[in-house]
Amino acid sequence: MNQDNCRIKVNLKNNPYEVVVGSEILYTIGEELLRINIRTGEKILIVTNPDVSKPYSRRFITSLKEAGYDANLLILEAGENKKNYESIALIHNAAYEHQLDRGSLIIALGGGVIGDMAGFAAATWLRGIDFVQVPTTLLAMVDASVGGKTGVNHPKGKNLIGAFHQPKLVLIDINTLKTLPQREFRSGMAEIIKYGVIKDLELFNKLENEEDLSNIYSIKECVLLELIKISVSIKARIVEKDEKESGLRAILNYGHTFGHVIETLCGYGHWLHGEAVSMGMVLIGQLALRKNLWNVDDALRQEKLLTKAGLPISWPKINNEDVLRTLKGDKKVDKGNIRLIVPLGIGMVEILNDVSENEIKSLLESI
């Protein structure tokens, strides 16, 4: 590895692991598995999608086989509209066909949807087998691949079916971003901006100082590496303190409660996850203004930075009653109370557990 690559430890009590971040490290997967003591000869099922499989899977499998593993490939259609029971059944069928046992491994090679599905399939096959995350989208690199959340969507709500199942390893090669559509890249940038708002003023300032955040080719590789490392480190430290989201980890949901409403009501896939989160962040920013929790300047800074990243900031045209009904079914609702993460300033948020339905209704009517 060159000096720009790094290993970020996620120090969980029962399931510690490393996130390896670097450039041109995708095909070190075989040696990385040997390093974490995955025995040679074990069966490995790689779950990926067509856009990722075409440029990467052949050499990826070669790396595994050269390390002594029995590797097989399953190609699934990705996208939020495919994140369902049917796709999980396809993974389980492949696990049965290739005779995966409790010593076997599932590798997610792809974006957040592939990672969520492969992780959930691993969590539920034989009551749980190991899996590895190899994210190929910016959003998956800085968010979905770290922390052990896995699952699928339900027609009534996003990610309502799932499990906490920590990976054995996360391998991030930023070179895979070069084949990523620009819209997907911008979607991932929303999560990096989120980290700045919830926890890191310095990161937010750094993002503001970049001329263009909407195009991967306008950001220097060293800068992109640093942004990913900072984001992963922030999430790792939060997950270490609250693995199962009983308290602090909830701040990672900033913008997500309303973002998930958008994804559910507009149809999975109509808006990308980061786009929906961006609109959710702006709406929560407006709520914070109404409650005098932060100032207009910070709200405008957030909106300006999201716009610079090419992200939408205007709430879509959806029925307010549908929004309220969907909110009540969100997994972050506790005993009927709507729990929201609201900003106090750039780099600071707090959890509000008692936001009333009338407050939400008034907010929606004002935009």
UniProtKB/Swiss-Prot annotation:
The keyword Nucleotide-binding applies. GO terms for cellular component: cytoplasm. Its EC number is 4.2.3.4. InterPro entries: Dehydroquinate_synthase, DHQ_synth_AroB, DHQ_synth_fam, DHQS/DOIS_N, DHQS_C. Pfam families: DHQ_synthase (PF01761), DHQS_C (PF24621). GO terms for molecular function: 3-dehydroquinate synthase activity; metal ion binding; nucleotide binding. NAD(+) binds at residues 112-116, 136-137, 149, 158, 176-179. It catalyses: 7-phospho-2-dehydro-3-deoxy-D-arabino-heptonate = 3-dehydroquinate + phosphate. It is found in: Cytoplasm. It is an enzyme of class 4 (lyase). Keywords: Amino-acid biosynthesis, Aromatic amino acid biosynthesis, Cobalt, Cytoplasm, Lyase, Metal-binding, NAD, Nucleotide-binding, Zinc. Zn(2+) binds at residues 191, 256, 273. Binds 1 divalent metal cation per subunit. Can use either Co(2+) or Zn(2+). Gene3D superfamilies: 3.40.50.1970, Dehydroquinate synthase-like - alpha domain. One of its GO terms (biological process) is aromatic amino acid family biosynthetic process. Its cofactor is NAD(+); Co(2+); Zn(2+). Pathway: Metabolic intermediate biosynthesis; chorismate biosynthesis; chorismate from D-erythrose 4-phosphate and phosphoenolpyruvate: step 2/7. It comes from the Bacteria. SUPFAM superfamilies: Dehydroquinate synthase-like. PANTHER family: 3-DEHYDROQUINATE SYNTHASE, 3-DEHYDROQUINATE SYNTHASE, CHLOROPLASTIC. Belongs to the sugar phosphate cyclases superfamily. Dehydroquinate synthase family. Catalyzes the conversion of 3-deoxy-D-arabino-heptulosonate 7-phosphate (DAHP) to dehydroquinate (DHQ). This is 3-dehydroquinate synthase. It comes from Prochlorococcus marinus (strain SARG / CCMP1375 / SS120). The lineage of its organism: Bacteria, Bacillati, Cyanobacteriota, Cyanophyceae, Synechococcales. The gene is aroB.
